[in-house]
Amino acid sequence: MRTLWIVAVLLLGVEGNLWQFEMLIMKIAKTSGFLFYSSYGCYCGWGGHGRPQDATDRCCFVHDCCYGKVTGCNPKTDSYTYSEENGDVVCGGDDPCKKQICECDRVAATCFRDNKDTYDNKYWFYPAKNCQEESEPC
């Protein structure tokens, strides 16, 4: 059900940030965020609680924490600008809030790329009942 909700949001807000996040994941990690990270572990996908299950899930935990620190705009819907310089994604634009959203997404996409070897199919569609431990602080 959570995946259907994400699909609906992505389709409705194609110009918004969730679509851009998907594009950054594809560009940096060379994989689909929607297919591999939209419902993984305790933190990848909508919401998040408990303890991250592995390094991949921790990427999502850190991303959630990063979004939680953004003030003045909506990380899940606001669009941002970025460019590529020498193969690296560089967040830009005049709005510091939107630039911060871009940085959250860039860091998460890089984390996914750097931790591909920790991805474990047993955490794909991981039951929320297994994420009941107390969450660690950001």
UniProtKB/Swiss-Prot annotation:
Disulphide-bonded residues: 42-131, 44-60, 59-111, 65-138, 66-104, 73-97, 91-102
Cofactor annotation remark: Binds 1 Ca(2+) ion.
Chain positions recorded as Ca(2+) binding sites: 43, 45, 47, 64
Additional information: Negative results: does not show myotoxic activity.
Stated name of the protein: Acidic phospholipase A2 BmooPLA2
Record keywords: Antibiotic, Antimicrobial, Blood coagulation cascade inhibiting toxin, Calcium, Disulfide bond, Hemostasis impairing toxin, Hydrolase, Hypotensive agent, Lipid degradation, Lipid metabolism, Metal-binding, Platelet aggregation inhibiting toxin, Secreted, Signal, Toxin
EC number: 3.1.1.4
Signal peptide bounds: 1-16
PANTHER family linked to this entry: PHOSPHOLIPASE A2 FAMILY MEMBER, PHOSPHOLIPASE A2, MEMBRANE ASSOCIATED
Native organism: Bothrops moojeni (Lance-headed viper)
Record-linked SUPFAM superfamilies: Phospholipase A2, PLA2
Reaction catalyzed: a 1,2-diacyl-sn-glycero-3-phosphocholine + H2O = a 1-acyl-sn-glycero-3-phosphocholine + a fatty acid + H(+)
Keyword flag Signal: yes
Entry similarity comment: Belongs to the phospholipase A2 family. Group II subfamily. D49 sub-subfamily.
Enzyme class, broadest EC rank: hydrolase
GO molecular function: calcium ion binding; calcium-dependent phospholipase A2 activity; phospholipid binding; toxin activity
Cofactor(s) listed: Ca(2+)
GO biological-process terms attached to the record: arachidonate secretion; defense response to bacterium; lipid catabolic process; negative regulation of T cell proliferation; phospholipid metabolic process; regulation of blood pressure
Localization (cell): Secreted
Summary of the tissues where the protein is detected: Expressed by the venom gland.
One Gene Ontology cellular component: extracellular region
CDD domains recorded: PLA2c
